[in-house]
Structure formats: C-alpha cells, structure tokens
Amino acid sequence: MNASLLHGMRPTTAGAAAVSTSLRARAGPYLVCRRWALIADLIAMASLSAVTLYQAGLLRHLPDPPMRGAASDRVAASPAAYWVLHAPDAALGIVSYASTLLLATAGGADRYRTTPWLSQLFAAKLLGDGLVAVVLLREERRGGNGFCSWCLVASAAALLAAPLGLAEGIAATRVMRRARAKR
C-alpha cells in the first residue's frame, strides 16, 4: 500500500503535476479563452445564487435595477421556474454552470492534443449553454411577467462565453482527424 495514503495525503502523478503547472503558469490562446469562460461561468453562478436563495425562501426580495419590465421576484417565483424536477431553476442552472466550469479547468493547456474529446465536449457545452440562454430569454419575454434582471446577467454571461471554446474544439477535431488518417 502507498505510504502517502496511510498518512492521509493524496497520491500525486507526474500528469497531475503537469496539469497544475500548465493551468496556473502557461499562456496560449485556448487557455486564455478557457479562463474567460471560467470567469463568465462564475458570474452566472453568482447571479443565480441570489435567485436560488430567493427561490428557496432564504431571501424575501430580489432587488432589481430601475428598469422598465424588471420583475425578478415575479419571474423567479412563477410555476415555470420550478417546472424541471420541481426544483428551483436557478439551482439547476448553477449545477449546469458548475459542469461547464469543470470542463473549463480540466486538462492542461495542450489538452486539444492530449485529450481532444475534452476540448470538443467543452466547446459543445459552451454552445449548449448559449442556446439554453437564448431559449430562456425567449420564454421570459413570452411569459409576459417581465424579466428577471439576475437571470439576464447569467444569460448574458453564457452568451458571451458560448464562442470561447470553438477554436479549441476545432483544433481538437483536426488532431483527431489526423490521428484517424494515420491508422
């Protein structure tokens, strides 16, 4: 048995150490985009955290900016906001953005070569998040109850992040095609 496990320490591998260094110390266009996507996801999660607190009864009111149509309380308390799994939709959004956050931080700077499927999954997830944001914005507009300013922040963050994984996803696809062609 590994002695480090007996002392409550996690075993380390050269690969994990390389990823740690790569994420923290390296640069590159794909890593920069991943970092911006990470920031956008954290903004979306922070915004949805306030909505979740309201939807769970821990806040009595969600303040809105002085804008026409702003009605965060009404939108966040609507039956539509509890439709999926009968759970607050903001909490589900946080879970979704947390998975995007994980994909943004998994793997080193060159993961498009080492684990191309991860880069492709990240690109697809960002595009999916952007698509969901568009659908939710459309539904909020159709609902006629006004809009949730907190939810708009999350949607804007998702839309800004949506294209950030494309270049890495395309590079990963090229790597996979070259590998198949060599077989």
Outline where the language-model segments fall.
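Short amphipathic, positively biased membrane-proximal segments
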Residues: 1-183
